[in-house]
Amino acid sequence: MADEIDFTTGDAGASSTYPMQCSALRKNGFVVLKGRPCKIVEMSTSKTGKHGHAKVHLVGIDIFTGKKYEDICPSTHNMDVPNIKRNDYQLICIQDGYLSLLTETGEVREDLKLPEGELGKEIEGKYNAGEDVQVSVMCAMSEEYAVAIKPCK
């Protein structure tokens, strides 16, 4: 039959974001600002004006780059909130600037770059010292980055 549909390449259909009313957002929560997943560090609401809704002023820090983003939106409007997943993997080795990580199921991931800056130096230092460490990887909006390191249990 030529009409058969092949689903083998499809994903689970889970969205990388979900909508939430602006007035329901809270400090230390997450929101998408200027297309980037951010943690809300500052939030203020202006009073309802003569010509419209109360406005919410949001200030967020990109969870991956640390860059600051701001946005203002009416309190009744919906904003996108990123679905954030955090996983811990055991560090096996570092090769050509990439991390080799062991998953809970015993599979090896080699697609994650060694982070730049202090965290990258700390991971490399502990690896070179022969310490067993776990790397915390945060995933949001089809991006994954190593965000923390801790000793293995």
From Swiss-Prot:
- GO BP terms, alphabetized: positive regulation of translational elongation; positive regulation of translational termination; spermatogenesis; translational elongation
Q: Which residues carry this modification: N-acetylalanine?
A: A2
According to Swiss-Prot or TrEMBL, what is its membrane topology? Peripheral membrane protein
Q: Does the keyword Nucleus apply?
A: yes
An example of a Gene Ontology cellular component annotation for this protein is:
nucleus
Q: How is it modified after translation?
A: Lys-50 undergoes hypusination, a unique post-translational modification that consists in the addition of a butylamino group from spermidine to lysine side chain and leads to the formation of a hypusine residue. eIF-5As are the only known proteins to undergo this modification, which is essential for their function.
Compartmental location: Cytoplasm; Nucleus; Endoplasmic reticulum membrane
Q: Provide an example Pfam family for this protein.
A: eIF-5a
| Subunit text | Binds to 80S ribosomes. Actively translating ribosomes show mutually exclusive binding of eIF5a (EIF5A or EIF5A2) and EEF2/eEF2. Interacts with DAPL1; interaction takes place at the polypeptide exit tunnel of hibernating ribosomes and prevents translation.
**Organism whose genome encodes this protein:** Homo sapiens (Human)
Q: Which family does it belong to?
A: Belongs to the eIF-5A family.
- Which CDD domains does the entry link to? S1_eIF5A
Q: Which gene encodes it?
A: EIF5A2
List of residues that carry Hypusine: K50
The entry's protein name is Eukaryotic translation initiation factor 5A-2
Function, in words: Translation factor that promotes translation elongation and termination, particularly upon ribosome stalling at specific amino acid sequence contexts. Binds between the exit (E) and peptidyl (P) site of the ribosome and promotes rescue of stalled ribosome: specifically required for efficient translation of polyproline-containing peptides as well as other motifs that stall the ribosome. Acts as a ribosome quality control (RQC) cofactor by joining the RQC complex to facilitate peptidyl transfer during CAT tailing step.
Arranged from A to Z, the UniProt key words for this protein are: Acetylation, Cytoplasm, Elongation factor, Endoplasmic reticulum, Hypusine, Membrane, Nucleus, Protein biosynthesis, RNA-binding
| Tissues showing expression | Expressed in ovarian and colorectal cancer cell lines (at protein level). Highly expressed in testis. Overexpressed in some cancer cells.
Cystine links in this protein are: none
Give the InterPro entries listed for this entry. Answer: IF5A-like, IF5A-like_N, NA-bd_OB-fold, Rib_uL2_dom2, Trans_elong_IF5A_hypusine_site, Transl_elong_IF5A_C, Translation_prot_SH3-like_sf
One GO MF term, please? Answer: translation elongation factor activity
Signal peptide interval: none
